[in-house]
Every structure is written in C-alpha cells, then in structure tokens.
C-alpha cells in the first residue's frame, strides 16, 4: 500500500477507538447530493466484499474507505448485534478468526458454546460483549497469507459508522448490508422495545434516509441492496421497506438457517417463482453456478439463465486474486476470471476482496463514459 494512504488510516483508527458513540464521518447535506458523481449503472457492479479486505482487515473503516478510493460501486457488510443490542459490522457470529479477542485476558471467561445453524460452535461471540467491550478489540486479517501489518490497529465499527462512511464519500457509493444469522441473533439478543433484529436493521436504514425501489430517484441518491441467506427475513421486511433485496444462496448441499430446505431446493424454479415478488436478485456462491472438480470448472448450470428469465439480477461471491482461489482455467490471472464471469456467464455484479483489481479490469475493458 502506498504511504499516502497509511497515515490517514492509522489516524482514523484512533478516531474510531475514541468516538464510538456517534457516527464518525461528517454526513453530507442534501445540497451535496446534487454535486456528487452519480453511481454508475451501465456495467456490472463492483461489490467490495467486506471492504477492500484483500489489503486491510475486513469490515473495518479503513477497508471500506480504501474500497471507495479504489472504485467500488457498493461496499458490502454483515450486520450482527452486540450484547446490548447495538448493530455492528462483523462477518462471523464469533470473534476468534478476525479479532485479537484471544489476547484479551480480561475476556477469557467469555468463551461459550452455542448451536449455530445446526452445529455446535465454541468461541467468543459478539452477543456476549457490549459495544464498549467490542470496541477494545483489534481487527485482524482472516487469512495468514495476506498482509498482517495492520492487525490490531482498527476496531470493529457499528452499522451507523459504516453507513456514515458511504454517505460521506466524495461520490455516490452504495451500501450492501446483510441481515446476518437472524435466527441466532433473535435467539440471543432481546431488545427492550420487543423489536426483532430485522426491525432494528430496517430502522437504522430509515434513520439515514435509505428508501426507494431499484433505480428510482431516491435509490440513485442513496443506493442500497439488502441481502440475506434467510428468505424469511427478506419476506418479513418486505412490508417495512421498498429498498431492493437479494437472496443469498450457499452450496446446494447446505440447509438454510431459517427453513429445513437445502439450497438445491432453493434454486428450483418453484422457489425462484416464490421469492421473486420479494427480491430483485440472487447472490449465489459462484460454485453453485459453475460446479468445480479438482479445481477445474465443470459445465455451468442454468441458474443464471433461469434467474434472468425472471428479471432477477445475479451477484455471485467471492472473487479473490490469490492463486489458491483461482481455478486452473484462469492461469493465475484474476482478469481471466473476471472475463469469464462477466462476459461468458453474464452476471450483473461481482463480490470481490480486491476492489481495485476489478475496477482496473473494467476500466480497461468497458470504461465508463466521461460523465460517469
């Protein structure tokens, strides 16, 4: 990373640690909206998966700011809750793999075992820590082969702080929050007003003015996609917000967290017809679209064609640049992978850990018009 980015990110980490009670980033006025460069809608979306987490610890403020700087159309996050009911940005329900919680001896007695999606999981869980306690933890890189120099330097951020980063960007940047593990969140966290996790999620979005159907004037001003692996959550919030929603799809052998169906059943024509009134697209694991055997691509399924025939967008996940994530056909070249998915498979957006790489590819192959 160039030095010009390092000092601002380190200074930001200090601000985040000391200003947890409010959004950290100056929110733009209504007048500023009109002067911002608009969201591009002429080519598939560059979706910053947990921020630019190929370079910086995932779901931290610097990772999101870096992704915006590199050209992300949307910054993606996972929403969970703290013990005291504050919505936070963190992918896993436990803290073990992406924070330094194990180094905090004061929390040694917080280790628990919970059943999560039908499996027993042991570790340190977000639902056993207040926001104040979570803010003392430092984020770290999930993968040991990625840059470790920023481990422990950046804290967990709240949903409000994440939104503020997008709203204060120098151009219009969309948000892509996930209603993460809603069954577990509703089991473990109880809000004083009797509301559910999904209620709190939507309330936060409304507080910041997110509304409007896909490509509407309101949506273009503050773009958003709401995502979840739990179809019941997307159906539940459908009467609360008209913001566009996408249904996430995992490996076909896995059971959904909120029903007893496998994702093989979820990708059937009948289920796509059922979910279509509630969503504008699906977000499948890429190997669900194109199966893989011995790291080689098999014959693509017809999932994209069946989704497109129903006017559903397709945003697969996750595109990573490292060799161990690239199938043999791509000869260790992420540009070949982008070309395959965007031009042969024909998807509508890519979730990537390397926003800058995808942006550079798109600018090379399909540069935006000058006004965008």
UniProtKB/Swiss-Prot annotation:
Broadest EC class assigned to this enzyme: hydrolase
Catalytic reaction list: a sn-glycero-3-phosphodiester + H2O = an alcohol + sn-glycerol 3-phosphate + H(+)
Signal peptide residue numbers: 1-21
Glycosylation, residue list: 120, 239, 260
Pfam families: GDPD (PF03009)
Example of a GO MF term: glycerophosphodiester phosphodiesterase activity
Keyword Nucleus: no
Induction remark: By phosphate starvation.
Any one of the GO BP annotations: lipid metabolic process
Family membership: Belongs to the glycerophosphoryl diester phosphodiesterase family.
The protein's name: Glycerophosphodiester phosphodiesterase GDPD6
The species this protein was found in: Arabidopsis thaliana (Mouse-ear cress)
Gene assigned in the entry: GDPD6
